Amino acid sequence: MAQEFSARFARHKDELEWLFMELYNNREGLEVLEREMADAYDARSAELKALDKARAADPNWYKRGNMFGMTMYTDLFAGNLKELAKKLPYFKEQKLTYLHLMPLLQMPHPHNDGGYAVEDFDTVDPALGTNKDLENLTRQLRKAGISLCLDFVMNHTASTHRWAMAAKAGDPWFQAYYHLFEDRTIPDRYEQTVPQVFPNTAPGNFTWCEEMHKWVLTTFHDYQWDLNYANPAVFVDMTKSILHLANLGVEVFRIDAVPYIWKQLGTTCRNLPQVHTIVRMLRMVLECVCPAVILKGEVVMAPKELAAYFGTPEKPECHMLYNVSTMVNLWGALASRDTRLLKAQLDALHALPGNCWFVNYLRCHDDIGWGLDEAAEKRFDIDPQKHKEYLYHFYAGDFPGSWAKGELYNYDPATGDARSCGTTASLCGVEQALESGDTIALDYAVRRDLLLHSVMAFLQGFPMLNSGDEIAQLNGWDYKSDPNRADDSRNLHRSAFNWENAKQRTQKGTLPNKLWQGMEELRKMRADECFAPDAWVTTWDTHNPGVLALVRKHGEETLVGLFNFTEYPAGAGLDALGGSYRSADGQPVWLADVELEPYQALLVKNV
């Protein structure tokens, strides 16, 4: 079996060593890295090595139409990892193939940025279980055909991580793991060019550490210390932890905040070339040791910045990225009843190279940040600032005529910037309709919810639900009464899973059943051969800004999706798309003149 590792390592050895030495010029560090790789391979179980072999023979496994994902917090869904494993029948009922558990490694309590402040990259947080519990869970999921994804927070550690504690105690070895400064001279120069992530709740990019009498670079919160990737020991230690988790059965790593990991004075410290060197090296390490494992990048950047994070077909980096831009544009199109920006953004994504793949979603653990393409807005005579303000006020429910119930996050009155929080159902109007007892409003809210999910599932890549979306879970306003959670409005959509409502998922006519059945229809849709990994996907002009058209082609087969983003009947004309088409119920459809119901998603197939 060691021959497999040797053969894989031989393919990457020259490039890996060249990149490492170019970045670090540290032969000793390179030798340590290569020993860690060999040790990790030796420690990998026979079952996981068999998975490596199968995945190497099927590199498109995560691009197939049957991929269907879900993300959740372990504690909110089931309490802990042992209890979550008992929920496997619920996952199998939904035919999930991908489960992303929010950060579950050891973290400080209660303030940990939702788990993104990590105290130990090798150990499950005791509140959620043990490493053995994680390993048992991954084994059960694997038998069920479900790949487990975990976050790997690359940019920073908690200020209570053992490295940080050693640094505070004066250990120079571990002080070199962070960016530390004795006075404000260099930090002030950084502040001139580096944007602030949380200007209101965590202003500035540096925090004073009284124990060391030094300034620490803290891009996010003051308890999250940025790692110094210019130190090869940091890269080696972090890679060792990823390999450790991979050997526990983790199959996908969401590498968090990856554009931020390299720091250089005089720059924004975003998207620097060295970031790509590090991700490329990490990709090669995984391909040598555990090729079943893939990387999902969290890159909250404009579409033009995304392609670089995939690398090239010859020298790939991330296997896939979160499709943040489309998520934002979907919500924007729904509130504005205008799909022009969404279409333009999708056209930009479709122009990316064929190796680019996305995880599509509507809601996740985070807020909706209104990072729309301002140049595109101006092309359509849309004022970017007024548009942004309209959107976040609309989804907070304080704009006249809004159906949504949500909250603002990180509102900055000086810049007029804010983000939006809330569950999919509540933002689509379900919560408001239930409170008012308006059955017509509820019907429209459900239509909106299903419309957005339909578009998401049709896109290039695969869909990922936020836990609770499949049963129309509402906002959890009770977070306001918890002093440990009340100061973060993102907790509005981070509430305990409603198992009582979930019991209604099979009861015809109930609200949970409508969403549950809607998700089942999407899985059936994705079984079509037009969802093959190499299918061609594009938008199509509908001659109506309220209607989006998406076309999928594979071989001789064509599948067309028409999506009405308005509450009115809407016409669409795809006169340039030739051929004859039928709807799912067998009715002929003339694409040159189609009439859609309010918020209808219509799928038609060529005959």
Predicted regions, residues:
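Active-site and adjacent substrate-binding regions of carbohydrate-active enzymes
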Residues: 1-576, 585-607
